[in-house]
């Protein structure tokens, strides 16, 4: 069995750009421009945190976005992905658990939220069994280009 660790990335490292780009290719069919500058924007921002799951190589990641509003601090989980070669081993759950522990330890009180496509059956089951509850609301987006 492989050893895995989850690391909160504090400094941008060129060596992470390729593996993150690879994971993004498995997460979305949308073309994503990801380079060192994009990594810098994430890890140097006080409003986001990037967690990397490593074995012998980078095998997964998760990002959280943090903001405050009049109704309290909100934390959004984004871009959760485990490389397809390592799925089915509970590694997505490890990433989610790490994000939850980080929020409890560093950001509480806060509300941790995420969205998931209903077609992603395994991901939705992971979130429900991790303690997330469905929020009956519509999510809308508008791309500012």
Residue locations for each model-derived region?
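Conserved N-terminal entry element of GNAT/NAT acetyltransferase domains
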Residues: 1-14
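Alpha-helical elements of Rossmann-like donor-binding domains used by nucleotide-donor carbohydrate transfer enzymes
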Residues: 19-23, 38, 94, 98
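Active-site rim helix/loop that mediates acceptor-substrate recognition in acyltransferases
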Residues: 29-50
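Conserved beta-strand in the GNAT
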Residues: 52, 57-66, 76, 81
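Residue-level recognition of the GNAT/N-acetyltransferase active site
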Residues: 78, 83, 87, 117
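Conserved acetyl-CoA-binding loop-helix of GNAT-fold acetyltransferases
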Residues: 82, 88-101, 125, 129
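Conserved active-site alpha-helix within GNAT-family acetyltransferase domains
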Residues: 93, 118-136, 141-142
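Conserved GNAT acetyl-CoA-binding A-motif
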Residues: 103-116
């Amino acid at each position: 069995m492989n050893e895995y660790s989850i690391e909160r990335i504090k400094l941008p490292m060129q060596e992470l750009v390729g593996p993150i780009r690879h994971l993004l290719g498995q997460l979305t069919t949308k073309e994503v421009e990801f380079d060192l500058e994009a990594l810098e924007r994430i890890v140097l921002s006080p409003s986001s945190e990037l967690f990397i799951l490593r074995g012998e190589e980078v095998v997964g990641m998760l990002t959280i976005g943090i903001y405050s509003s009049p109704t309290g601090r909100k934390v959004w989980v984004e871009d959760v992905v485990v490389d397809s070669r390592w799925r089915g081993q509970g590694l997505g759950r490890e990433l989610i658990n790490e994000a939850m522990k980080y929020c409890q330890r560093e950001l509480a009180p806060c509300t941790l939220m995420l969205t998931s496509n209903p077609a992603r059956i395994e991901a939705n089951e992971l979130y429900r069994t991790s303690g997330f509850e469905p929020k009956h609301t519509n999510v809308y987006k508008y791309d500012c280009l």
